[in-house]
Amino acid sequence: MRTARFSNPPGLCYVLRVPRPNAIQLGDEISIPILYEDRSVLVIDKPAGWMLVPYNWDKTGRNLQLALSSSILGGEFWARSRNLKFLKYVHRLDAETTGALLFSKSPGALKTYSEMFESRRMSKRYLAVVRGNPKRQEWTCDARLGPDPNLHGRHRTDAQGKDAETHFKVLEQKNGLALIEARPVTGRTHQIRLHLAHAGLPIVGDTMYGAPEDRTRKTALMGLRAIGLEYQDPFLRKRVKIEAPSKEFIEQFFLVS
C-alpha cells in the first residue's frame, strides 16, 4: 500500500492510500496475475509463450525473467509500489506451460527456496490433458531421463539418465482425452511431458513429445498447467499453500463435446 500526503487548503492534510496492483503489467497489453505474495516471495500465474531460460539468442524476445527485471529497473508502478529491487525465479516452467511460478525477492530468499526445491521440500501439482485412455486410475512413473544427443533442447527416457519420479491420477475422461493430476517428486527437464508420453498418453498440444497431429501445429495450446505449490515456510514458520485457478484451463479442452 502506497501513501501520498498533500495539503489543500493550508493546514488541512489528506492521506491518499493507493493499493498495490495485484498483477504485473508488462507494457500496455500484458497483465500477469499475482497469486500469492509475502515479504520473501511472489508467485505469478505464468502465461504461455514465455521462456525463463532461452536456449538460443533467437528466443530472447519472450524472456520472462528479462522482461520482469527490465520492468523493475524502469520503475514500473507494480514494482515501485512494492519497493522491489530484485526478483528471480526459483524454479522453472516450460515456455508453453502456464500456472504457478515462484519468484524470490532477495538473493537470500533465492538461496533458501532453491534449496527447498532441490531437497524436495516443495510439493507441486499440475493438471495435464492427454490423448488416449489411461490403463489405470493411479500410477507412478520412474523412467530415468536425459538429454537427446540428436536434438538440442529435447530430452528422452534414458536408462543411463537421471532419476525421475512422477505420481499420476486420472480425474476425468471424455472424447478420447483424459484430465490427469501430476505430482512430480523430482524436477527434471520436461519430466511430466516425457513420463506421460512414455505411458502412451501424450499431452495435447505438445509440439515436441506429442501425437503427430500436435507436432505439426506450432500454435496449439499445450495441455499442461501448474496448479499448486505447498511448503513449510522457513521465514513465516507456517504451512503455505498456493493454488492457481484451473476452471478456464479445463474448459478449453472439455467443453467441446
Language-model features and meaning:
Residues R2-S257:
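RNA pseudouridine synthases
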